[in-house]
């Protein structure tokens, strides 16, 4: 009898499947914090740009997700020996489709589209430049959208590292309409 029980226990131990993490379940929510470079990699130069953002993502069926958040983008435009800053403050709402994931649910790749609306400030509202020139671009409300390719890499059950590539298209302002962004971030699952 002992031999029979030992064989059953050994077979159960050997033939059981692995348990996988339960990630991206419907109604799970996470807070994302991101940092991006905008329009190329030019840190500290007269033509550099960067953005910071935070968002709340809520997962739906099949691992897709809704995303709602805000972002601050600063793009410096070269002017003679200086620069003219253009800042954008935007709110975002969008839907992302899961296009790829591994079997162990560690890496997820998403493609999504978002609607954006916000405010653009050119040279922080100052019309006269440092050399006495007058700036004709004005502050304005902006609106548009973004296409995003997003990768999540889970390092723990509730913590994921993020990488993203996105293209923003915004109307209403006097400056550039397109902004390409790439960057990294972290996501913390809150429920």
Question: Predicted regions: what is each one?
Answer:
Residues 39-42, 77-84, 131-137, 169-173:
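Extracellular loop and loop/strand-boundary signature of outer-membrane beta-barrel proteins
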Residues 20-75, 187-191:
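Short glycine/proline- and aromatic-enriched beta-strand/turn motifs that initiate or cap beta-hairpins
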Residues 124-165, 188:
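Extended low-complexity acidic/polar segments
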Residues 73-75, 150-191:
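Predominantly the C-terminal beta-signal and adjacent terminal strand-loop region
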Residues 1-28:
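Cleavable N-terminal export/targeting peptides
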Residues 55-130, 188-191:
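Gram-negative (and chloroplast) outer-membrane scaffold detector with strong preference
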Residues 3, 25-29, 62-64, 101-107, ...:
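Short coil turns and loop connectors of transmembrane beta-barrels in diderm outer membranes
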Residues 27-31, 46-52, 83-91, 107, ...:
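Residues that define the transmembrane beta-barrel architecture of outer-membrane proteins
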């Amino acid at each position: 009898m002992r031999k029979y029980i030992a064989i059953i226990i050994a077979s159960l131990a050997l033939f059981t499947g692995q348990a996988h993490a339960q990630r991206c379940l419907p109604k799970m929510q996470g807070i994302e914090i991101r940092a991006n470079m905008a329009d190329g990699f030019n840190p500290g130069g007269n033509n550099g740009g960067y953005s910071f953002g935070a968002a709340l993502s809520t997962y739906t069926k099949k691992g897709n997700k809704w995303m709602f958040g805000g972002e601050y983008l600063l793009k410096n435009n070269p002017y003679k020996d200086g620069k003219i800053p253009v800042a954008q403050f935007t709110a975002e709402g969008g839907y992302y489709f899961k296009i790829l994931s591994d079997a162990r649910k560690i890496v997820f790749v998403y493609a999504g589209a978002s609607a954006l609306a916000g405010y653009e400030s050119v040279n922080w509202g100052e019309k006269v430049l440092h050399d006495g020139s007058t700036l004709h671009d004005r502050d304005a409300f902006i609106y548009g959208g973004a296409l995003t390719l997003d990768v999540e890499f889970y390092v723990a059950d509730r913590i994921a590292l993020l990488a993203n590539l996105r293209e923003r298209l915004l109307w209403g302002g006097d400056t550039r309409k397109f902004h390409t962004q790439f960057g990294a971030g972290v996501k913390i699952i809150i429920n």
